[in-house]
From Swiss-Prot:
GO terms for molecular function: 3-isopropylmalate dehydratase activity. Pathway: Amino-acid biosynthesis; L-leucine biosynthesis; L-leucine from 3-methyl-2-oxobutanoate: step 2/4. Keywords: Amino-acid biosynthesis, Branched-chain amino acid biosynthesis, Leucine biosynthesis, Lyase. The keyword Protease does not apply. Gene3D superfamilies: Aconitase, domain 4. Heterodimer of LeuC and LeuD. Its EC number is 4.2.1.33. Belongs to the LeuD family. LeuD type 2 subfamily. The keyword Metal-binding does not apply. SUPFAM superfamilies: LeuD/IlvD-like (SSF52016). Pfam families: Aconitase_C (PF00694). It comes from Thermococcus kodakarensis (strain ATCC BAA-918 / JCM 12380 / KOD1). It catalyses: (2R,3S)-3-isopropylmalate = (2S)-2-isopropylmalate. This is 3-isopropylmalate dehydratase small subunit.
Amino acid sequence: MITRGRVWRFGDNVSTDTITPGRYNLTKDPEELARIAFIEARPEFSREVKPGDVVVGGRNFGIGSSRESAALSLKAAGVAGVIAESFGRIFYRNAVNLGLPLLVGDTSGLRDGEVVEVNWRTGEVRTENGVFHFKPLDGFLLRIVEEGGILSFIARRGDLCIE
């Protein structure tokens, strides 16, 4: 699972309301959700984001309301995954359940707009300025993400058995 794309950098405490603001969040349609991702924080995001791009946050990325639409909007927009110093617990689980990879660690070396190559299995991120190492998802969660999310995982295996 190696991707290459542009960094979309955000700060600390990015809430699910920042990712998909409630007043726009009236649909479950992935294409519509992709259009509202970061509509108030970065209006250009939905027009300019490309498949393989990476969202980078600071501490507490995805805090706030229990909105599956926040993770779904990023995946639907083509975001390859999210790298942050820490995640809101519900966003973290929603992302895994939807098949959106996550890495955890110090993001201070990643700059907005730079191109990165991310190995989501190992946590290695290559930039023009060097190589950075992040904590990848553990084995079971990584397998769920690699299957495309929890529903695909169960459909292929018949249950949640990890053996």
